[in-house]
């Protein structure tokens, strides 16, 4: 696992908690300085994490995408069976899709979606606080969005089943279905599809995050077609937009290439 940390803030606090929870305490972290970087981030990171892991601070002017791809390659060690989760803490002062699309992390996410063996996990926070708040969730619940028992959904479930430290794992399906839970191998929750899919997802997720001690990792099976001008489907984009600023929600994209 790898955290790409822009700052040591509330979002990074959540990312460290998540990595410790599902990574068995073992993960790496990297930082590329920018104009707004806190010059003391290395020391503050050490104090916050106790030195495990140390923050790999790269030289100013380094390309974030190249740095992350280099770290991913080192973690995979040329093994095709190794999956690396890249955790991206993203903190916003306000809910703005325009601001989110202009950030360097947006371009990084698009590039990572095309990288074999990489899962991208967004850990967002909307706050003006510039330091960790000092409290994190106690429970981690996973919901795999399951439209049908197809290869994309099975791959997402396989990834979710391999994550330790999870208190509950289920699939989440909206609307009627003509297949059984046994086709996925995990329990399936059925929820009504009322209006837009994104609104229905938010309704179900908020039932879980109403408990402030609970965080929800929404696992999204995503079809990626690198041969098309439009890399991602409109369904996946709409889901990501509705969850990007949602408190206590982590969004993990599990891409399957067409």
Spans of model-derived segments:
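Structured cytosolic domains appended to multi-pass membrane proteins
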Residues: 1-253
């Amino acid at each position: 696992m790898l955290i790409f940390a822009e700052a040591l803030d509330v979002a990074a606090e959540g990312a460290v908690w998540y990595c410790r929870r599902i990574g068995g305490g073992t993960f790496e972290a990297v930082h590329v300085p920018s104009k707004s970087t806190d010059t003391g981030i290395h020391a503050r990171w050490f104090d916050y994490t106790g030195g495990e892991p140390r923050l790999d601070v790269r030289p100013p002017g380094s390309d974030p995408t190249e740095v992350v791809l280099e770290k991913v390659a080192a973690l995979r060690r040329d093994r095709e069976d190794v999956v690396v989760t890249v955790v991206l803490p993203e903190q916003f002062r306000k809910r703005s899709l325009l601001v989110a699309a202009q950030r360097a992390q947006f371009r990084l996410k698009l590039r990572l979606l095309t990288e074999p063996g990489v899962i991208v996990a967004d850990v967002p926070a909307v706050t003006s606080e510039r330091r960790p708040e000092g409290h994190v969730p106690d429970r981690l619940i996973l919901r795999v969005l399951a439209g049908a028992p197809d290869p994309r959904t099975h791959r997402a479930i396989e990834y979710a089943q391999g994550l330790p430290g999870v208190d509950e794992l289920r699939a989440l399906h909206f609307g009627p279905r003509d297949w059984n839970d046994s086709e996925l191998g995990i329990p399936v929750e059925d929820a009504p599809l009322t209006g837009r899919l994104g609104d229905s997802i938010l309704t179900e997720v908020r039932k879980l995050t109403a408990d402030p001690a609970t965080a929800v990792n929404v696992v999204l099976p995503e079809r990626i077609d690198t041969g098309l001008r439009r890399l991602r489907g409109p369904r996946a984009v709409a889901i990501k937009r509705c969850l990007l600023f949602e408190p206590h929600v982590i969004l993990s994209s599990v891409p399957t290439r067409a």
